[in-house]
Amino acid sequence: MDLISSLSLGELALSFSRVPLFPVFDLSYFIVSIIYLKYEPGSVELSRRHPVASWLCAMLHCFGSYILADLLLGEPIIDYFSNSSSILLASGVWYLIFFCPLDLFYKCVCFLPVKLIFVAMKEVVRVRKIAVGIHHAHHYHHGWFIMIATGWVKGSGVALLSNLEQLLRGVWKPETNEILHMSFPTKASLYGAILFTLQQTRWLPVSKASLIFVFTMFMVSCKVFLTATHSHSSPFDVLEGYICPVLFGATWGGDHHHDNHGAPHGMGLGTQHSGLPAKAKEELSEGFRKKKTKKAD
């Protein structure tokens, strides 16, 4: 961190950490969150037939992280809805994205250069929420796992509540559980929560402002690049590909191997036979024909 101080980035990081999020950054967060809601199949039809359900889904996309964090900490889960300004702002964004004539607002905010700006600003909010979540749970003192869990859900609570949001839309897809298939923001929020927990407990000799600045730059760079290239990959995939076999004794992409074990018995037998040499296959086939002939006799 001496390098950061010598480059006068310490003051920049401190000033950056004090920038208020409301209303500009929160507005960007709401816009991107509700855009992703509109991407979901059937969401437009839902907004026409059941606008209340669509509005609830939008509020869950915007404030799901606060709801889940309050649930973990035993606080009222509707406490954040007392913030009328944020609720009205998010509701206005929802209405414009779904009901603006000719979809003008939606087309404007989805224009890629504009969308990239909103995506970058959303990541600023995400990192700040992770840091606030760690600080919020710091009264547990040595409860590291509680602090990490709180920071994690603050950063990715919307994704972790995706199954609940699907139920509000009348859809049930348990195979899309975010725990089973973590996206880049969910993984990054988890790793970020670990870093901020180490900083909060003084195991990481870095100021909170500097950590917020550095991690925000990382998140903004990665997310903007992934959005611009329309990629669903994760920058962590390469690192996890090397670490997972060492720590967990499984090759990367081991789910496919597991799926083979879960195949029907007939399919498993066919798979076993397909792995045999050609001569062994012929012997098995010949033996099967002889056995069938004896039964016929």
Curated annotation (Swiss-Prot):
Report the domain of life of the source organism: Eukaryota
> Where in or outside the cell is it found?
Sarcoplasmic reticulum membrane; Nucleus membrane
Main localisation:
membrane
Q: Which residues cross the membrane?
A: 19-39, 52-72, 86-106, 144-164, 178-198, 209-229, 234-254
Please state how the activity of this protein is regulated: Channel activity is activated by a change of voltage within the sarcoplasmic reticulum lumen and blocked by luminal high Ca(2+) levels.
Q: How does it sit in the membrane?
A: Multi-pass membrane protein
Subunit text: Homotrimer; conformation seems to be controled by binding to diacylglycerol (DAG).
| Record's function text | Intracellular monovalent cation channel required for maintenance of rapid intracellular calcium release. Acts as a potassium counter-ion channel that functions in synchronization with calcium release from intracellular stores. Opened by a change of voltage within the sarcoplasmic reticulum lumen.
Q: What is the protein named?
A: Trimeric intracellular cation channel type A
Quick one: which gene encodes this?
A: Tmem38a
